[in-house]
Amino acid sequence: MRRAETIEKLYLDFDGFFASVMQQAMPELRGRPVGIIPFETSAAYSTSVIACSKEAKAAGCSNVMRVPEALDLCPELVLVTQRPDLFRRAHNALLNEITCEIPIETVKSIDEMTCSLDTSAIADPAHLAQNIKQRIKNNIGEYITCSIGFAANRFLAKMACKMDKPNGVTIWQPEKMPGPLFALPLSDIPGVGKKIERRLNAANIWSIADLWDTQPKHLRSLWGNVNGERMWYALHGYDIYATPTGRGMFGHGRVLPPNWRDRLHAQSCSRLLLTKAARRMRREGYFAGMLSLWIKMRQGRWSDSLELPSVQDDHACLKALTALWDKAAKHLPLKAEILRVGVTLHRLSAAHARQLDLLENDDEERQRCEVLSTAIDALNRKFGKRVVTLGPWTPPPGGYAGGKIAYNRIPSAEDFW
């Protein structure tokens, strides 16, 4: 484990990414408080603001806030329906511009990324930050801004990035540490939520200064895992990287518009979501051993899972989904108002590691279904749109099912077919 002696990492976070992209694309929104809602509906009061502009944040609004609450805080709030494909294209265009100044090391989410610094960037990080900002302004637009942090490692650079938002630059040279940290509350440390903060307080750790002086093994015991110890080393400027994890699941969820909250419409939506999840799974070369269905109602929640014989074709996935809905029908209230539905394919195995069950998933029917799904995928890719589907395909109002606004997953163009 190595402790950096100079700044080595850049962390970039776009300011109010979704709303600022909309303001750049729609001049009539510029300078106005904007709230992004998940779908176009005449009953906007029944939904939530899922992202908002800096003008809306200045008025007290926040991401994931009920529309009535947001309008109480900011009566001038302009509600705009999300445009995930626009966000995807903006993300790709912005990455291209940043890459012209410095190679991108890791894309953390649709609006955050990290870079390793070369000798010229280490010598003059402020100049690099200014070049990135100017390139974005000149080639993309002035309404999309970013905040940039420089530090010894990625963890500290992320914290520095949050210090001067929006459109700021913060440089934490190792020789100046830990001074800048001590002015921050514990909750500003990535990974310290309310539960962990309560544990720290119970151990008489009330500030980052207290945390700094705590032994790393003690933090490991307070966290209950190695993350507490890793966090201590990251705060102290060590080059810490988490062990890469494999793909765990493919899934989609959808908030249903008011006129789609009956069981038949919810089932139709889940069918579409599952087809898209299965298509993503095939694209990445995985098979699933379990399907889960979850339903959020005004009257409560219901969820269940069904084992699968290591499959990836639409026919097998949709057959299992029908079985889960048949089970759900026995438990849901007769007139259940379903607010949200979701599906998850998990217990994944890569194609090269797939264990076949000779009785269930290696017969002629299964092979035909897999060939059929692969052929459908190829046709849709060839024509660049959805030309063939297995059964009915009726997206819910608002569109973008399976291609929704995303922080931790950047949709591909195929997710919008």
Task: Please state what every model-predicted region is.
Residues K108-E112, A151-R154, Y286-M290, A336-R340:
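Short Gly/Ser/Thr- and Asp/Glu-enriched loop/turn motifs at secondary-structure junctions
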Residues A25, I104, N138, F150, ...:
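Compact, charge-rich alpha-helical regulatory domains located at protein termini
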Residues M1-I110, T114:
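Residues that scaffold, gate, or flank divalent-cation-dependent active/transport sites
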Residues D13, G60, A70, D111, ...:
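A residue-level signal for conserved active-site and pocket-lining positions in enzyme catalytic cores
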